[in-house]
């Protein structure tokens, strides 16, 4: 049973993904791709703002992952703008919290200042979860600032036509030729 049950369940789920779920999802993705490729600049900026805000809403939670999965799905259709907006916006919360602990040291205790250093490094790697301790401690101030910052970042990214072909990597994707 230890070997058979996982094998059978993987087979059932895999076949369901291919034959039941795959075709409708492919159709939806094709429609979204067509819409993205034909939209004007204003709509692209709005999409960037929405995706950017989603990336910062729960910092690694389901809303964040939905935006990320959307961007990764578009990579297969060679639509690279949304992924750039998603990655740039996803880096906002940890970078903002890390910079805040350095700029306004007196507003943070020693443990938070150390957490800010870690958040800064995680932010450079596109790991949003570095900002969670700050958001958990003061959600009414941290979350709105991060969401607005992420939305602005996503909008700017789409407005300038930034493109990203890598699904992850943060600042380190700049090293890829």
Show which residues each predicted segment covers.
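Pore-lining transmembrane helices
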Residues: 1-177
